[in-house]
Amino acid sequence: GTWDDIGQGIGRVAYWVGKAMGNMSDVNQASRINRKKKH
C-alpha cells in the first residue's frame, strides 16, 4: 500500500544519506592520515 511505498522511499533515502556520511568520514580520515604522514 501507500505506507509501504513511503517506508521504502524513506529507507532508500536513509541508506543513501548513510552512505554519503560514511564516505565523508572516510575522506576526513584519509586527509587526517595524510597530514600525519607529512609531519
UniProtKB/Swiss-Prot annotation:
Mind telling me which InterPro entries this protein's record contains? Alpha_enterocin/lactococcin
GO process annotations (BP): defense response to bacterium; killing of cells of another organism
Q: Which UniProt keywords apply?
A: Antibiotic, Antimicrobial, Bacteriocin
What is this protein's function? Kills Lactococci.
Assembly and partners are described as: Bacteriocin activity requires interaction of alpha and beta peptides in a molar ratio of 7:1 or 8:1 respectively.
What's the protein called, per UniProt? Bacteriocin lactococcin-G subunit alpha
Q: Which species? A: Lactococcus lactis subsp. lactis
